[in-house]
Amino acid sequence: MADDKKIIFSMVGVSKVIPPQRQILKNIYLSFFYGAKIGIIGLNGSGKSTLLKIIAGLDKSYQGNVVFSPGYTVGYLEQEPKLDPEKTVKEVVQEGVKPIMDLLAEYEEVNNAFCDPEVLENPEKMDQLMARQAELQDKLDATDAWNIDNKLERAMDALRCPPDDKKIAVLSGGERRRVALCRLLLQQPDILLLDEPTNHLDAESIDWLEQHLQQYPGTVIAVTHDRYFLDHVAGWILELDRGEGIPWKGNYTSWLDQKTKRMAQEEKQASKRRKTLERELEWVRMAPKARQAKGKARLSSYDRLLNEDQKAREEKLEIYIPNGPRLGNKVIEAKGLAKAYDDKVLFDDLNFMLPPNGIVGVIGPNGAGKTTLFRLIMGQEKQDRGEFEVGETVKIAYVDQTHKDLSPEKSVYEVISQGVESFRMGGRDMNARAYLSKFNFTGADQEKKIGVLSGGERNRLHLAMALKEEGNVLLLDEPTNDIDVNTLRALEEGLENFAGCAVVVSHDSWVLDRIATHILAFEGDSKVTFYEGSYSDYEEFKKKRDGNVEPKRVRYRKLTD
């Protein structure tokens, strides 16, 4: 039987109930083939991460059975990896090739033993030592162990890991995830379980990871909100919907097409969700020139959106973003802007102008200056040189993602309601509980304490807080991290119909292709490019501008030869 037809594990009647008596997995029967590439999608709280933990053997409090064929190994990347804080980056990454490191250590011990007088004086011990040395040499040759340092360096470079001598204790959450992912990929397990693998990765690292997983011989099961990733890697989509696991053959675009047709058959009246799916499918089917035209049309439609009936817009959209005050001609302008910290120059001679109704996607590696740009806009930082001006009519809506001012003891409902059942939004009364439900906080979830929220729940709350501010310029810092695809789709539509500007830091190229009218690209070495067009338009522009000269790290190289 060919490997791609061999079932390596099955889930037999798997169910899971969490307090207070909420069933998130309901009687799931699934079989998984060796080599299959599976993307898991569903609302936050639908059981995606729980499913991975059950497969990984970390969650045993479920009903039913998970049956593995003998001899297969499982590797798991969790959302918040637990790493030894006392180890360095290199020491943790080396754990991914522990069998090879153990062989090298023993080989060194054997070589050192040749100097032992007891061995030198005993021909029998010398023969035994030479035989073991030859055995180890064969194993090391077979695994190309002599090039292990190059392999580790290649892997760490591909995923932009921090310097190899840095202690884990001083790393950010994003840096820890990259180190953990690097270690896992080097282990090369037969079954690779990935929980939001693209979070905290820049576009180049995501591209490398996609190519690596496309060629990965084993089974890959990934929970992700990144729809381009699902399109490029997945051969199957597993949708978790109200506890049921529904498999769909094909990538994300194929799922979108099949799902829309199925919903059309099941529903006589068009729901908001179905209409949202249909509009995304319409966008997917657009030719590139039609997408460009749509982006340009947004820039000239500010007055139309501003004067549109907000009640009708709210009824049409799953996430409705109310218009803020009318913007003047000057929104945000930078001329010859420069900013550095000590010897590190973030940008030099930065120039851009954000027009009314523009949506700027901000891209670039971590530490390049994206957060500093937000701080400049907020007036929390000053430039070293140049002119930076925020227009007088600008009202900024932004919530610090660190949530420093939020008490962990407060509930989601208390944070949004501020002690009142309804508040004014878009010129109308909005019920606080109804507003939260738009961000998939329903029922008991609204009473969850801030201190126990997951990453995805925190980001949804962050969005709800920011959009409630009724600003005319939205600053969204990584709004797509850990958020389910349904909420992302609704957010995209909300932004498309918003009469105002947005500055969105994101590594999600699908989101930027749908919403961005401009790209502000932090390209490294203090170079920043402001480009009118979507993310894909910018990528094409960059290829034409740079020709075949690409940074060495962009080119895909395998971890193993």
Regions found by a protein language model. Give the residues of each.
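Alpha-helical segments in transporter systems
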Residues: 138, 287-290, 297, 318-324
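Intracellular alpha-helical coupling/juxtamembrane segments of multi-pass membrane proteins
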Residues: 258-291, 295-301, 305-312
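ABC ATP-binding cassette signature C-motif
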Residues: 1-271, 315, 322-561
